[in-house]
């Protein structure tokens, strides 16, 4: 996070307006502008662990990571700068949370790319902080309003639920495949062998559906789940609990917080970070897997068929197999061998 996003570049056109403000930055924080903008004081709240990692190095305790912001997170702020995400329910969760904490009279700025649907901020906040568009550049919109009424916020009302083959999946806004099991995960699940044993790590666990489906027909596996997303971590914990399955779940930027080695690592890795296309997480997953697999252990991932993962798998493990595929997706398998250890 060094170069500024288009949304941040639009904000910088108004940097003089923020010099005397005590600002809370929140939403889809894709760069480190919150740490670099000249203000009277700056705080940041994010639901994304990898964004918090970057910001906390520069902002210390003034950068916070959690599912739900608290009064302490917004203390003494008189301005909110909210970066609109690509997911409207996620924006509603975060904005209703934040506006329920900020005092009436707080200046509200909402910025985002037009393709993300930032225009819908006007309707969403009409009853609380009526917005006007104050700038348009870099295919982004910047909106301004003032908080007139605090909304009521109840995080419990944002939970969703669906069933997959008799399993209960708990979800929250911003979690991948919130409305049902995606095709890629279905393909990966079809390759998992019943009665598997050992330690299994689910990286980028989302709502936890891969892990609970695996554990149902392989009850002796020991599960560890991680994700960069606070909503995903909480959703996975709830999904495990709803199905009576035990497992450790925590926030991690791929392997950043993972300790130890595993017999299998499974993943449906993301290739979008907000509105941006990024292969970094998946490549970090593949290259880092050799440090977290036991000898003979395997990495098994599903990905869009067009993504360039075979070369990275071969560079890291020495070989790979495609064990299932459709027109759109492939399931890759790589085994931890002595050859892989040299990589």
UniProtKB/Swiss-Prot annotation:
GO terms for molecular function: 16S rRNA (guanine(1207)-N(2))-methyltransferase activity; nucleic acid binding. Its EC number is 2.1.1.172. Its main location: cytoplasm. It comes from the Bacteria. It catalyses: guanosine(1207) in 16S rRNA + S-adenosyl-L-methionine = N(2)-methylguanosine(1207) in 16S rRNA + S-adenosyl-L-homocysteine + H(+). It is found in: Cytoplasm. Keywords: Cytoplasm, Methyltransferase, rRNA processing, S-adenosyl-L-methionine, Transferase. Pfam families: MTS, MTS_N. InterPro entries: DNA_methylase_N6_adenine_CS, Mtase_sm_N, rRNA_ssu_MeTfrase_C, RsmC/RlmG, SAM-dependent_MTases_sf, Small_mtfrase_dom. GO terms for cellular component: cytoplasm. NCBIfam families: PRK09489.1. Belongs to the methyltransferase superfamily. RsmC family. PANTHER family: RIBOSOMAL RNA SMALL SUBUNIT METHYLTRANSFERASE C. Specifically methylates the guanine in position 1207 of 16S rRNA in the 30S particle. Monomer. HAMAP family: 16SrRNA_methyltr_C (MF_01862). This is Ribosomal RNA small subunit methyltransferase C.
């Amino acid at each position: 996070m060094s170069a500024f996003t288009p949304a941040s570049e639009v904000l910088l056109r108004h940097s003089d307006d923020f010099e005397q403000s005590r600002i809370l930055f929140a939403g889809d924080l894709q760069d480190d502008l919150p740490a670099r903008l000249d203000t009277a004081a700056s705080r940041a709240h994010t639901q994304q662990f990898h964004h918090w990692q970057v910001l906390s190095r520069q902002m210390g305790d003034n950068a916070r990571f959690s599912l739900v912001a608290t009064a302490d997170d917004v203390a003494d702020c008189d301005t909110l700068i909210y970066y609109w995400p690509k997911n409207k329910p996620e924006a509603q969760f975060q904005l209703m949370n934040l506006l329920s904490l900020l005092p009436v009279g707080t200046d509200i700025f909402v910025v985002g790319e037009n393709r993300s649907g930032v225009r819908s901020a006007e309707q969403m906040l009409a009853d609380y902080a009526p917005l006007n568009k104050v700038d348009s550049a870099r295919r982004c919109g910047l909106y301004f309003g003032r908080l007139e009424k605090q909304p009521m916020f109840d995080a419990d009302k944002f939970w969703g639920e669906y069933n997959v083959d008799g399993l209960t999946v708990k979800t929250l806004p911003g979690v991948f495949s919130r409305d049902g099991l995606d095709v890629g995960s279905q393909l990966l699940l079809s390759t998992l062998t019943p009665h598997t044993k050992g330690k299994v790590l689910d990286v980028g666990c989302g709502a936890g559906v891969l892990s609970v489906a695996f554990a149902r027909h392989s009850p002796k596996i020991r599960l560890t789940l991680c994700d960069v997303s606070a909503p995903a971590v909480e959703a996975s914990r709830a999904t495990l609990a709803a199905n009576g399955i035990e497992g450790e779940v925590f926030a991690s930027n791929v392997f950043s917080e993972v300790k130890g080695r595993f017999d299998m690592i499974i993943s449906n890795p993301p290739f979008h970070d907000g509105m941006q296309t990024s292969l970094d997480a998946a490549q970090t997953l593949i290259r880092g897997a050799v440090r977290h697999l036991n000898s003979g252990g395997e990495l098994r991932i599903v990905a869009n068929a067009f993504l360039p993962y075979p070369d990275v798998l071969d560079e890291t493990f020495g070989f790979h197999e495609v064990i299932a595929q459709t027109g759109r997706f492939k399931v890759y398998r790589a085994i931890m061998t002595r050859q892989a250890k040299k990589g």
